Amino acid sequence: MKRKIYEDLLRWKQEEAGRTALLIDGARRVGKSYIAETFAKAEYKSYLVVDFNRVSQAVTDLFLNYMDDLDLFFLYLSNYYNVKLYPRETLIILDEVQLFPKARAAIKYLVADGRYDYIETGSLMSIRKNVQDIVIPSEERHIKLHPMDFEEFLWALDNEVLMDFIRLHFVKRKPMEQAMHRKAMDYFRQYLIVGGMPQAVAAYVQTHDFDRVDRVKRDILELYRADIVKHAEGYEMKVAQIFDDIPAQLQKHEKKFKFSSLKKEARFREYEDSLFWLADAMVVNMCYNSTAPNIGLKMNMDRMTLKCYMADTGLLISHAFDENGIVSEALYKKLLFDKLEVNKGMLVENIVAQMLTASGHKLYFYSNSSREDTESRMEIDFLIAKSKISNRHNISPIEVKSSKNYTLTSLKKFRTKYQDQLHTPLVLHTSDLKEEDGILYLPLYMTPLL
């Protein structure tokens, strides 16, 4: 499937010319190995894949014993995989490199040698056990691969033009008009319920069978649970608790993560490492409270007040509606036609978080629960900074609305209190684009353009 990260890989190859290795970090089943091998086939004369999920001891011994004799290292590697290596025309892929950290450490010597290019793929790249016995090489360029975004989903459905049409109307700030808006929302609802995991998207493209799509997503969720048991050593129970509680936490009105729902009188610090594990695995997107909308939202971050979104909304649906082990075709069709009588707010807010993350935004929100000052009490779903920072008006508050009837009490109070710091206030909703009273209302499918 066509992925935008391919252009990043091309840029790395052209700019670095072997001076760095490329590390692709991402959740399991997000398409890291596929994109690396697709790139290798198209852009190199030869390539080989060292898959550390099923590597032999003979190969791992090469990394341990032959870094001081790279001529022999490459000779053995070439013969073991029966692949001829061509100087500056061969790519060596180290797949799931976190499973053998010594191979990651060897990148320092392999890159310095300069004969070949290297792409590493992996997840959990920062977890202590994956880095504690190595020096992390400075010769790495690090990029993240997220689930497929809305435009990539459209490409998979053989629609190469709709996002360009949406982009044009976004830039001109003109409504899409009824027919095209309805068409875009139909595609958006498909994206919402299928999600962006490549295997799920492929199943949907091939069959349009929601039962099959759900089985694919459920297999991925089971893989994540198995990874928690296998790799979250020492705190696997807490990681599993958080993971299983995400739908219930997002179903609440405020959506802030309450650790007391996991255990009476539980505190953030007790679960901090477990949250970091899930974030590092890129299974979740963390969103932190920023107590003031100033330049540098991170400087005002309250890291103990947070929201925990699933990294893929399609997975969230399979995770949340799980009474009988599989989400029925009937339920999916109710979601598709906007007929399901549940609080869709958690799904819509989750996919906005997913799309903002894919666009490169760090996730922040604003929460003030003051009991003394009711005018200061407000909740803003997201805060994003504009791309070019100036001395004023840098932060856009975002409210996400899943229904047609809503109020903007918090947004209006927030705008009054922080007017000097704010860029354009935004409302993401199910209706068409409009501007009214200094607020820009955007259809949900325009979120990736922010």
Language-model regions, residue ranges each:
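Short regulatory helix/loop adjacent to the ATP-binding pocket of P-loop NTPases
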Residues: 109, 126-142, 154-159
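Hydrophobic anchor at the beta1->P-loop junction of P-loop NTPases
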Residues: 24
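Short glycine-rich substrate-engagement loop in P-loop NTPases that contacts/grips substrate
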Residues: 56-87
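Interdomain hinge/linker elements that couple catalytic modules in large macromolecular machines
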Residues: 158-348, 354, 362, 368
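Conserved lysine of the Walker
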Residues: 32
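A cross-kingdom feature that marks ATP-driven nucleic-acid transaction machinery
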Residues: 13-20, 29, 38, 42-45, ...
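Pre-Walker A adenine-sensing motif
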Residues: 1-16
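Structural recognition of the conserved hydrophobic beta-strand(s) that form the central parallel beta-sheet
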Residues: 93, 117-123, 144
